[in-house]
Amino acid sequence: MILLGVSISPFVRKVLVMAAEKGIPLEHRQLSPTTSEDPLFLAASPFRKVPVLIDDDYHLADSTAIVAYLEARFPQTPMFPTDPRERGTATWYEEVADTIIFPAGQKIFFNRVVLPRFLNRPGDLATAAEAQATLLPPVYNYLEKVVPVEGFLVGGSLSIADICVTSMLVNMHFCDAAVEPALHPRLAAYFKRISARPSFARLIAGDKAMLAA
């Protein structure tokens, strides 16, 4: 199987981490959705969404669809709880990550990292600062209340909930909007704990090197 998409995307990271945790072999090909003219990518993702999964003659775009497919295709080491309530809660956190955390952080990451680093354009630093001051604190305040002192967001093992939330928080650490232990100690400890897992740590190290190059 092949996964297309740039690893700095939290949605690509989400799939790569899940695959690593489940032991699914994936060939990852770095690809920018805004500039790529790869015919395989364009055929599989007409709206230029990443990541894109290529599984023989089956193509699938969008991280939520991909992780659901991978869970069904490779049920070993489940990342979605089997208990109905826990599964519902895990799906809720996936939705929070995609529709609440990502929009809050995107203005910061896009203006401080994507525009200057990848598109050779100056970012709107005032917009980034305003987003950090107004949009991010409610997100961090909420997560501070719900993350556990030890363990995982849902149930007794790593789940898609932890993968999705942490994948988004990684990008905040890349754009000077990291969780501050003095303000959000539980969230900071949770992030440190989950992001230290080999599935995350390897990707984070690679992205740091890419951003520093």
Residue positions per predicted region:
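GST-like domain detector, emphasizing the conserved glutathione-binding G-site
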Residues: 1-126, 130
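A generic structural-conservation signal
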Residues: 28, 156, 181, 203-204
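Alpha-helix boundary recognition
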Residues: 42-43, 95, 148, 195, ...
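Aromatic-glycine hotspot motif
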Residues: 53, 64, 136-139, 199
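Generic structural signal for individual residues within well-ordered alpha-helical segments
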Residues: 88-91, 164, 188, 201
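GST-like fold's C-terminal all-alpha helical module
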Residues: 99-196
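Long hydrophobic alpha-helical segments typical of transmembrane helices together
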Residues: 186-213
